[in-house]
């Protein structure tokens, strides 16, 4: 079977589950993963035969994909902020909306902390003066794959970055990604909703979290590939306490956020005003930011002076 025939066969099979465009995109991704060749190179060699072991691999991937398993879990790869991250079913698949959260944090860190921005620039050019600048400390709560802290460390290399999760398996994935990207991150296994554990977490300048925020009742509206494969622990909260994690984050920030620090959280698109009100009720100035689809997706909160 040639490269071209293999891709056409895969794409046709995927149209049982996806529209034509998405099926084509997934087929491209899988073929690049199997062959190690970019699309342009595969086109130039479309009549080349696919090696038997590669064909076996492709058939196994196809079998998994036809069970609605997300392609990121099949290939154990998801792209985030221009970097490949290892993912498996112990962690959520990183979403483009979360990249916007990372961008917002980076902009705030540079814009509100000019001394830190200079320090980062100084490190890039080997300026020894940067060693005297204050260290920016940040904590990602519920880190999952580690995509947020790893990406922030890449953007803000002088930052001291911490990340916690209740899941030992998720932390193993996050540590693997930090090592692959050569980004030192301090990982901690913590049940964040247990306030007795807060003393083990550092005081920081930035708290970031993409916590579970989907009410259990929303399961009926969700795609099968999400429900069947992504970890429910990282997705769902009780219908009667949908803001449980945001309440805990706000209370933790009251005690562990530096005086000029900031909280950034990803939110449910329907709960923006309620999340903002929650932070404001605990003494924060809060702001909602929409994502690229025009949906309420992020909240920034700063303690009122």
Task: Name each model-derived stretch.
Residues 1-43, 47-50:
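Non-catalytic accessory regions of SAM-dependent methyltransferases
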Residues 14, 109, 178, 253, ...:
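Conserved hydrophobic residues forming the short capping helix/wall of the S-adenosyl-L-methionine
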Residues 29-108:
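Conserved AdoMet
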Residues 30, 68, 98, 148, ...:
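Residue-level signal for inorganic ion chemistry
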Residues 100-121, 126-221, 248:
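Conserved SAM/SAH cofactor-binding pocket of Class I
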Residues 213, 302-305:
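C-terminal beta-strand of the catalytic ATP-binding
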Residues 213-244:
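Mobile active-site "lid"/loop adjacent to the S-adenosyl-L-methionine
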Residues 239-302:
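Conserved Class I SAM-dependent methyltransferase catalytic core
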């Amino acid at each position: 079977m040639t490269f071209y025939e293999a891709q056409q066969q895969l794409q046709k099979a995927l149209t049982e589950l996806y529209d034509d465009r998405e099926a084509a995109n997934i087929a491209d991704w899988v073929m690049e993963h199997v062959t190690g060749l970019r699309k342009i190179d595969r086109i130039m060699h479309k009549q080349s035969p696919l090696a038997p072991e590669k064909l076996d691999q492709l058939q196994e991937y196809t079998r998994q994909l036809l069970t609605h398993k997300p392609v990121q879990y099949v290939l154990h790869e998801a792209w985030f902020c221009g970097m490949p991250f290892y993912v498996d079913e112990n962690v959520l698949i990183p979403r483009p909306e979360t990249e916007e959260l990372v961008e917002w944090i980076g902009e705030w860190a540079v814009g509100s902390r000019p001394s830190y921005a200079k320090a980062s620039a100084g490190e890039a050019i080997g300026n020894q003066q940067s060693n005297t600048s204050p260290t920016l400390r940040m904590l990602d709560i519920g880190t999952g794959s580690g995509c947020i802290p790893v990406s922030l460390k890449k953007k803000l290399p002088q930052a001291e970055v911490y990340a916690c999760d209740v899941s030992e398996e998720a932390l193993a994935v996050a540590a693997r990604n930090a090592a692959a990207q050569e980004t030192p991150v301090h990982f901690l296994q913590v049940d964040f909703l247990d306030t007795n554990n807060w003393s083990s977490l550092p005081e920081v300048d930035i708290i970031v979290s993409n916590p579970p925020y989907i009410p259990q009742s929303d399961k009926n509206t969700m795609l099968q590939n999400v429900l069947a494969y992504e970890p429910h622990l990282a997705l769902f909260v009780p219908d009667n306490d949908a803001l449980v994690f945001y309440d805990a984050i706000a209370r933790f920030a009251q005690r562990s956020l530096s005086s000029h620090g900031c909280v950034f959280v990803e939110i449910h698109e329907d709960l923006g005003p309620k999340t903002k009100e929650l932070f404001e009720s605990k003494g924060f100035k809060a702001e909602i930011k929409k994502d690229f689809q025009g949906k309420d997706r992020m909240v920034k909160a700063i303690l009122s002076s």
